[in-house]
Design a protein with these regions (language model features):
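A short, N-terminal "cap"/entry segment at the start of jelly-roll beta-barrel domains
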Residues: 26-90, 130, 134, 138-143, ...
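Glycine- and acidic-residue-biased ligand/ion/polar-headgroup-sensing regions
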Residues: 108-127, 256-267, 272
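Conserved short histidine dyad/triad with adjacent acidic residue
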Residues: 75-77, 90-107, 222-224, 239-253
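C-terminal motif of bacterial Sec signal peptides marking the signal peptidase cleavage site
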Residues: 20-22
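Sequence-structural signature of mature extracellular/luminal beta-sheet repeat domains
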Residues: 65, 209-212, 316-642
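Short acidic-glycine-tyrosine-enriched beta hairpin
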Residues: 126-157, 274-288
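Short beta-strand His + acidic residue motifs that chelate non-heme Fe in jelly-roll/DSBH
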Residues: 102-104, 122-123, 131, 145, ...
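Ligand-binding loop in jelly-roll beta-barrel domains
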Residues: 145-150, 156-182, 288-313
């Protein structure tokens, strides 16, 4: 269950948990709370239009319950649930046996439902839709499927029925207000005849009845190191937030009640100034204006915060983040499959280095097995006609090319990675000449990615990702080749654990370099570059200086779990406004010219490289393993055509 989750500061109330038996007695915790509000100079606010609670929560204020400790309640044959509730919301974790059914019902409250495992056939007002969950594949030379968590928001009064798939399903339901029939089945006594609704409802930012994939929803940078997906409904608001390792959420308060579930990772909850380690499936209720904070551990953590009523400040933050993303990726733009190299011929394996030249897309087709063993004889360079999706090899069996860049005379500079050289090639596949194959009297190892400057020189990365156990150069490197052919190593060997993507700003004054792998037990080099994009000033002679962190790339949950810093950052491209697009395990991560996170383009498998194309240069072409995708943008891409 790797959803996403938590905020920092008074922005997304990241309340996380703590077992405090002495805090469950209202007078005691409130007295201490008032002292802490004064101590931290916090401003207490009260809400209007919030009904008096008619049902007492099963969770004490500030006290932790692990979801696994809750008793299971049978809702229907082969459908069992663990149920908990706050003042205005209810959550239930449903386990459905294979093909189990939840009969059609008229929903008595607004509801979100997320598919955590398996699949369901969901009837919404009689219309069927399939909803699924999929785990992330560990990326290698063959595999790379990205995760999927389908969800839907339905309003009170909607007709709903569910049938589990052949392997069953696990669902997360969130209701506001609480369901009286669920409470009856949970054995709660003396229930009221009805549950009051909020007088002042919020505007939903999701369409009722529309199925979404959680990983398609845009993340908001809530504070340094905290990114969240904010889903607002009329009666409640959800915040799926991820906090990076070591981040600290300072003490804060908010007038909305909050239920929070830890989904992944480790950390310490800080409630009423006391700390406690927390683990996945821990659940806590934070009453209105209770002082709380958190500290992320070595693997960071994800959590789901459920707010009642919805927080307007969160909604405004999410709105602003969406507007920034939509300024680049227009509303309605969808990732489109252009070519599937497992269904058409010639077969595509591990696609790389796409570049747009004279109305065609050119890219490398690298053969790898799952362990990244290469074979130049099974590799090729490909020309694709985007108007038809048809493609052909322009050269095959002669080199295992990687990055490419448009060069003089309408030709391409091509990184022949396994051939230890960079060549100039025509768009018909003819090698014109070897441009560089050595540095300091020794062969270069494996040129990976490349970018040309306005003077005809070029930069390339060499992460030594080659088959020879003994390398020629003394470490991973970044190089500059001037227009007259002089080769300069720009950084000390192994300054980057795995230098990969490289791109210049449109004005040519800044060079950006990313780092693919770092801090892994199985990788031979560690560096201090971690999961960052680094920016360097470009000097008049092509050398670089003033290296600095430009942006931080989000890490996937499997990398965080092993305490790695491998973003999978590969190819990068840039638009004329200076926005940077980075292919990573997480998707295409977009940053503005200041290095601020803008959003993510999600794909069915992790993107490897990308470029702008089409007549207006506003279409982003993205290669991913055996497939080629595209998506329209509002921005014009920058390429240094000579």
């Amino acid at each position: 269950m790797s959803l996403l989750s938590i905020k920092q500061t008074a922005m997304i109330g990241v309340a996380i948990l703590m077992t405090m038996a002495h805090c469950t007695r209202t007078p005691e915790w409130q007295a201490k709370n008032e002292e802490l509000i004064t101590k931290y100079d916090l401003t207490k606010r009260e809400l209007s239009g919030v009904p008096e609670p008619s049902i007492e929560s099963d969770l004490g204020p500030g006290a932790v319950t692990n979801l696994e400790s809750l008793p299971q309640v049978q809702l229907h044959p082969d459908v069992r649930a663990r149920i908990s509730w706050g003042t205005g919301v209810m959550l239930s974790i449903l386990d459905l046996a294979p093909n189990a059914e939840i009969p059609e019902e008229v929903l008595p409250a607004d509801r979100f439902v997320f598919v955590l495992e398996g699949s369901i056939r969901h009837l919404v007002n009689g219309s069927p839709v399939t909803m699924i969950s999929r785990e992330r594949e560990e990326p290698d030379g063959v595999h790379g499927a990205t995760p999927r968590t389908d969800f839907v928001y339905l309003e009170e009064g909607t007709k709903s029925a569910v049938v589990a798939g052949d392997s069953g399903a696990k669902l997360l339901e969130l209701y506001s207000p609480q369901r009286l029939d669920y409470l009856q089945k949970a054995g709660v006594q003396e229930l009221p005849n009805s549950v009051p609704r909020l007088k002042n409802t919020a505007d939903a930012n999701v369409v009722p009845g529309k199925v979404y994939d959680l990983y398609e929803m845009q993340r908001t940078e809530l504070s340094s190191g905290a990114y969240g997906i904010i889903l607002s409904a009329k009666q409640m608001q959800l915040g799926f937030v991820s906090i990076e390792p070591g981040a600290i959420v300072p003490p804060h308060i908010h007038p909305e009640e909050q239920l929070e579930i830890v989904l992944r990772g480790d950390g310490r909850a800080i409630i009423l100034d006391e700390k406690q380690d927390v683990k996945p499936n821990d659940l806590v209720r934070i009453p209105s204006n209770m002082v709380h904070g958190a500290e992320a551990g070595g693997v960071g953590y994800d959590a789901l915060s459920i707010f009642w009523p919805p927080r307007p400040d969160h909604q405004e933050m999410a709105k602003a983040a969406t507007q920034a993303f939509r300024a680049i990726i227009p509303e309605g733009a969808q990732v489109e499959l252009v070519a599937d190299g497992k269904k058409t011929k010639p077969e595509l394996h591990f696609t790389e280095g796409p570049k747009w030249v004279n109305g065609k897309l050119y890219f490398s087709n690298m053969y790898f097995d799952k362990d990244f063993n290469a074979d130049p004889k099974r590799s090729s360079t490909v020309e694709l006609d985007p108007s038809t999706g048809r493609y052909r090899n322009i050269i095959e069996g002669q080199m295992q090319a990687n990055g490419m860049y448009p060069y003089k005379n309408g030709n391409l500079l091509v990184c022949d990675m396994m051939g230890h050289r960079i060549v100039e090639m025509t768009t018909t596949g003819k090698v014109v000449r070897v441009v560089v194959n050595s540095y300091d009297g020794k062969p270069i190892d494996g040129p990976n990615d490349i970018v040309v400057d306005a003077k005809g020189g070029f930069y390339f990365t060499d992460p030594q990702f080659t088959m020879e156990p003994e390398k020629f150069q003394s470490g991973r490197g970044v190089y500059y080749v001037s227009n007259d052919g002089k080769v300069t190593r720009l950084l000390e060997p192994n300054a980057f654990a795995m230098p990969n993507g490289i791109v210049l700003s449109p004005d040519g004054k800044t060079l950006y370099i990313n780092n693919c792998y770092d801090d892994e037990s199985w990788y031979p080099v560690n560096s201090d570059k971690d999961n960052h994009i680094w920016a360097y000033d470009v000097n008049p002679d092509g050398t670089i200086s003033n290296g600095r962190k430009f942006a931080t790339l989000l890490l996937t949950e499997n990398v965080l779990k092993r305490k790695g810093r491998s973003s999978g950052a590969d190819g990068m491209t840039i638009d004329k406004a200076g926005n940077l697009y980075v292919a990573t395990f997480y998707g295409v991560q977009i940053f503005n010219p200041k290095g601020e996170f803008v959003g993510i383009i999600n794909l069915p498998s992790f993107p490897v490289n990308l470029c702008f194309g089409d007549d207006d240069m506003k279409t982003l072409y993205i290669v991913s393993l055996s497939k080629v995708y595209r998506i329209r943008t509002n921005m014009e891409g920058f390429v240094q055509y000579l």
